[in-house]
């Protein structure tokens, strides 16, 4: 026997140990007392030595280990296995102990919680649940009163809890786990098994086998894949699910276990008659002779509970009390059968209410029990009954039998189970299908959850449709996406929901009416709305995305509602409506003939008038990825948002067969459990992003057709920029930068360097490419960074940090090494710009108008034409002398103004007059003072500058030998003369090309002071006092003119003039006196090199003047 689990095992085992000890002591004491009495029966030592435990019993306690107490309800008696679930217990038995599966497996008692094997369960039912046949049947009045009191009004004490298994998809219940599982195979997995099912003789449309097929047809089906031939349709479905589809866990998940209250079994009112009595049943003889009168039957509750023993494996042991039951044709409408049945065979006799009962036959035959003389059968229940009737089986009181139902005595055996099939206008195939004669061993029973009645399976559907017909209520939930029969996904919450909690979750968001789009959070209110407003509306066809719920509302009386919720349909989206197809249909008046209406409803889905595209349904929807609220046409807005914002389109996963998304760049399919972060991660490495945007105009792409200015660009944009990049851009833009940061996102990104071919390089190689890109473009835009990241397979943050670090390093280098820009300021342009730079007095520049420059031009002529190629170094040396004097750079290029040649009266050698434009200021000084000073100096200048042809030739020779002189001259400041070559080369380079400036701190700061202006006249007066022709040469040449523009201290110019008289090379002293010592040692050699060609040319000039 099966023992139920026990709680508080600790305390029980302590007491059990004590009890066992006491019992063992008592037994030992009893043995000691009676050992002398049994000595005469004791065998000799030979038998004791040659006897083992196997001779005494089959179980040897020394060979086994004491097993722990198993608390789980389903324990295997052959091994230590135990389980909480019957499915696991049964699978264990099938796999481990399959040799005696049918006889040893535990079965559930349909009336109580007792479990045992088959044989023990039959004995249990016979002893404890067999109806008592000692009920009085003396008179019909007593029988009626008892029926009234006991049957129609059951007492509370008559109810008992019954453990049953139930199907979670519908209201099917059965005490046996196997029956419920077969029901699920047959009812809910036809679509799974349909592709595998094939018939031997013919091919069905979808492979499904009707429920009403007989045993011969069921034996003809087989599996297409492995040619497995099962015994029944359920066996084939089970084979497909477990062997091919491997989704047996879904079947297990659909089976639940609960306790229901059922009426306790009462004594059977049918009394077995004496053998000589042929009319039986204890009723008066006059009842059997009624032709067209009123027939009173037993109460349905009593009859079903006495005659229905839902054990398909009970043959004769459990129902011996029914062996001698005789049924008469006129009482119950059982039609005659045209053949005899032997002993042990059974026949299904149709009772009132379409509840056939399997009754094993004994020696009597059916012909003997059902004589053909009574040629009238009564089809009970032929009248239409009100829907509020609580009982269906055997309710035939005061029912007149129409004469059209009189049948001939010779009818086929297949009609025996269809006595009451005419009660419904259109019975389903389960009620009309002829069952096989030997089908009693697999008869399935179901308990009606509303009236707690137990019916055979083929009767249950008819009973439920007739007595408890559910009210169909359509609803729409576009935010629910049906994954499969057990799981759905809420697109609002982006979470997966099981079937048991799905309805409650949908009521939180609300269910919409498919006709008027009203939203309800209560099923009862929605049903009332459908009854009041849309009572004549026709429902659309049921699709694969429809979820069905069978509900019972407690509103005084039971109200059954069959809720049909249409969810997001992937096949119809977005072209067709993903909501209900009939949401915008015009009301179709109901037709009187339901068959014609069904044929008219077939083309509803394909007709363009009925199926309104869902994109025309304007409203609000929610993006399942970023939960943004979208307005406008729902399908268009969602598809457009997914393409533009997330760069995906909806599709079906080719393997998972679930809704997922596909990248619009590389057409890669995401998995069904992806999120928005998955898309972001993919776009970083997606190679199709760069290919799609590399120089192509995407205005003609489909994604650009309906783009509005408010929508984001194709690339997923981020509102914030990387912080180091953003700060640097702001700092640079606050300074005067002509470039603008704003850019049009529609324009294609043009990169400074093409990253193609570098995506497969190493990490260091890609970083070196970024360094090269930094040298070209140190300030990339956000879209450039995104494109570089996509092309080089790098993170955008890595690229931004790389550029930021490079910029910081440049700034640090400028601060540490104090570099100077070799080209001087263009002061004329610089004075036009508002700046905060402060210049010292020695770097003060004066601004001369064009009139003064023309006057000065008359005094000087260009020397380049006469000096030839050697004068290039001369001008270069002057250019770099200006840079030395400035000592710092500027982001402006120098512009040198060369005055045109002016012929003079005397034959003179043209002397260059170079006026640097950078030396001109916007502010004008006192021009009168300048004019007076120039007039005073004109006479002496024109007189002393006359040069002959011979000095000119000497100047050419001196220019040609300037390099040789540089090597011979000993420099006083210790500078290496060998640096003159590179210096001159550098001069030419800077003359031809513009300088690349580095952003950094300027090494020297200057200010414009009045002291510099006051020192200029003194310097000029000192220069005019000098009578030396060399000094006059300085004043009239371009280098002497520098004195007028570059205002030096007076002492410096005095030292320069004295050195010119004393030393053979006065230009060296002049150069040393003008070198800026603040420029740093790193620029000394460069300055010396720059000055070499200048001194060579100056030497030539001085020689010519001295020889003259």
UniProtKB/Swiss-Prot annotation:
Per UniProt, the C2H2-type Zn-finger stretches lie at 74-97, 107-129, 165-188, 221-244, 446-468, 488-509, 511-534, 621-646, 661-685
One cellular component (GO) term of this entry = extracellular space
- State where the protein is found: Nucleus; Chromosome
Matching entries from Pfam families are given as: ADNP_N, Homeodomain
Crosslink Glycyl lysine isopeptide (Lys-Gly) (interchain with G-Cter in SUMO2): position given as: 39, 72, 144, 155, 203, 231, 266, 274, 278-279, 311, 335, 367, 407, 426, 599, 605, 615, 620, 631, 657, 698, 715, 727, 730, 744, 806, 828, 834, 913, 928, 941, 1022, 1041, 1048
* Inducing or repressing factors: By the neuroprotective peptide VIP.
**Disordered: region residues:** 133-154, 360-438, 690-711, 851-1037, 1050-1108
Q: Where is the composition biased (Polar residues)?
A: 393-422, 691-709, 977-988
Write down which residues bear the modification named N6-acetyllysine: 1041, 1048
Q: Which residues bind DNA?
A: 753-813
* Residues recorded with modification Asymmetric dimethylarginine: 348
Q: Which GO terms describe its molecular function?
A: beta-catenin binding; beta-tubulin binding; chromatin binding; copper ion binding; DNA-binding transcription factor activity, RNA polymerase II-specific; peptide binding; RNA polymerase II transcription regulatory region sequence-specific DNA binding; zinc ion binding
What are the Phosphoserine sites (modified residues) in this protein? 98, 408, 412, 607, 708, 737, 804, 875, 877, 885, 888, 904, 959, 961, 1077
Q: Where is the composition biased (Acidic residues)?
A: 928-938
Keyword DNA-binding part of the UniProt annotation: yes
Q: Where is this region: Binds to beta-catenin/CTNNB1?
A: 1-685
Gene3D superfamilies in the record: Classic Zinc Finger (3.30.160.60), Homeodomain-like (1.10.10.60)
Instruction: Check the record and name the SUPFAM superfamilies matching this protein.
Output: Homeodomain-like (SSF46689)
UniProt feature, compositional bias: Pro residues: 426-437
Regions of biased composition (Basic and acidic residues) lie at 143-154, 851-880, 939-959
The protein's UniProt keywords, in alphabetical order, are: Acetylation, Chromosome, DNA-binding, Homeobox, Isopeptide bond, Metal-binding, Methylation, Nucleus, Phosphoprotein, Repeat, Transcription, Transcription regulation, Ubl conjugation, Zinc, Zinc-finger
Listed under subunit, the entry gives: Interacts (via N-terminal region) with beta-catenin/CTNNB1 (via the central armadillo domains); interaction is direct and stabilizes CTNNB1 by modulating its phosphorylation by glycogen synthase kinase-3 beta GSK3B.
Instruction: Add the further remark from the entry.
Output: When isolated from the sequence, the neuroprotective peptide provides neuroprotection at subfemtomolar concentrations against toxicity associated with tetrodoxin (electrical blockade), the amyloid-beta peptide (the Alzheimer disease neurotoxin), N-methyl-aspartate (excitotoxicity), and the human immunideficiency virus (HIV) envelope protein.
Q: What does this protein do?
A: May be involved in transcriptional regulation. May mediate some of the neuroprotective peptide VIP-associated effects involving normal growth and cancer proliferation. Positively modulates WNT-beta-catenin/CTNN1B signaling, acting by regulating phosphorylation of, and thereby stabilizing, CTNNB1. May be required for neural induction and neuronal differentiation. May be involved in erythroid differentiation.
Descriptive protein name: Activity-dependent neuroprotector homeobox protein
Q: Which organism does this record belong to?
A: Mus musculus (Mouse)
What phylogenetic lineage does the species belong to? Eukaryota, Metazoa, Chordata, Craniata, Vertebrata
- What gene is this protein a product of? Adnp
